[in-house]
């Protein structure tokens, strides 16, 4: 069952459903726009590989998601069932599942910059993600959009 979502609930209605649907290997194409850049580097587009896995939880009030970029471990996000979010990388914020099944994350990074991220599934193997980042003074710093396609493995019969 490797590479396939565990849940059959679509669109997801809970954080458990959303995280379960997210597990696996994803191919990501990201377009990023930096608002502070005055030269030709204001826009970039890059392809990457993301691996998402459910991690063990210390208690029944949290759900953990381990995120790896390529072959490198990136971070673990801890989703508290009361809507709080934190990571070992000093990210502290909140999460919310919307009625359309999308997940909204709002958090501050280690530098105090605010980021708002929305992730939603078009199909079980196609995720979209938009992120808007603000400077500490509230001005727009950057925006990005990702389309992510799940890598699936053909099973031999």
UniProtKB/Swiss-Prot annotation:
Coiled coil: none
Disulfide bridge partners, by residue number: none
GO molecular-function terms, A-Z: lyase activity
Entry's EC annotation: 4.-.-.-
CC terms in the record's Gene Ontology section: organellar chromatophore; plastid
Key word Lyase present: yes
Membrane-crossing residue ranges in chain numbering: none
Pfam family, one: CpeS
InterPro entries in alphabetical order: Calycin, CpcS/CpeS
Entry keyword set: Lyase, Organellar chromatophore, Plastid
Localization per record: Plastid, Organellar chromatophore
Signal peptide extent: none
Function description: Covalently attaches a chromophore to Cys residue(s) of phycobiliproteins.
Similarity comment: Belongs to the CpcS/CpeS biliprotein lyase family.
Name of the featured protein: Chromophore lyase CpcS/CpeS 1
Source species: Paulinella chromatophora
Lineage, uppermost ranks: Eukaryota, Sar, Rhizaria, Cercozoa, Imbricatea
